[in-house]
Design a protein with these regions (language model features):
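A membrane-periplasm/extracellular boundary helix in multi-pass inner-membrane enzymes
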Residues: 2-43, 59-62, 72
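Transmembrane helix-loop junctions and nearby membrane-interface residues
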Residues: 29, 121-127, 148-155
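Transmembrane alpha-helices of multi-pass inner-membrane enzymes
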Residues: 137-147, 152-181
């Protein structure tokens, strides 16, 4: 009964995290090869220059498990350089947080970032306060994750604080189920 449903919810929460991580790697590969740009352009979606700037970024990273990244703020410096040498008219960001994290932190960094946001935090909320807290966490993170694909929202204050404050508010009114450690 109840225990089985609770266990099923916990599995669903972890499966959701794994699914997002997998999607991000597939998406990153499609961005790297240009396949996502060709697909979206073929169906008439105006990428508003995203495809162009993503293609410029390609020279600065390798899609490989051995790629360790260029460091924090490397993407901002890269885009500024594109502007300075006249490749772009406006120094706007990549509009792709997944690509940004990969270029800056590399394969291990993106793996850690995904594991923390999509596995460790939901696991903690679920183990400490029950599956409803984990479900709420993903109810917030799922739509945000969609914006990570073509926008710059992963590090906005309002996104990151909302992602943490709403589950935290639920936890303040819930009794801990058990110690997650």
């Amino acid at each position: 009964g109840v225990l089985r449903r609770s266990h099923a919810k916990e599995k669903l929460i972890m499966l959701t995290g794994v699914a997002w991580g997998t999607l991000f790697w597939v998406y990153l590969y499609l961005v790297h090869t240009g396949a996502i740009s060709r697909l979206l352009n073929a169906v008439g979606i105006n990428m508003m220059g995203r495809d162009y700037i993503w293609s410029l970024a390609k020279d600065y990273y390798q899609f490989s498990p051995t790629f360790i990244g260029l460091g924090f703020e490397a993407v901002d410096a890269m885009v500024t350089r594109f502007y300075e040498i006249g490749l772009i008219d406006v120094a706007y960001p990549l509009h792709n947080d997944i690509l940004k994290v990969f270029v800056e932190l590399g394969f291990p960094g993106l793996c850690f970032w995904c594991a923390f946001l999509y596995l460790i935090l939901p696991w903690y909320w679920t183990k400490r306060y029950g599956p409803e807290a984990g479900i709420l966490y993903f109810a917030i993170l799922n739509p945000l994750s969609m914006t990570y694909l073509t926008d710059n929202t992963a590090f906005y204050f309002w996104c990151t604080m909302g992602l943490r404050m709403i589950p935290l508010a639920v936890c303040c009114f819930a009794k801990p189920t058990k110690d997650p450690a």
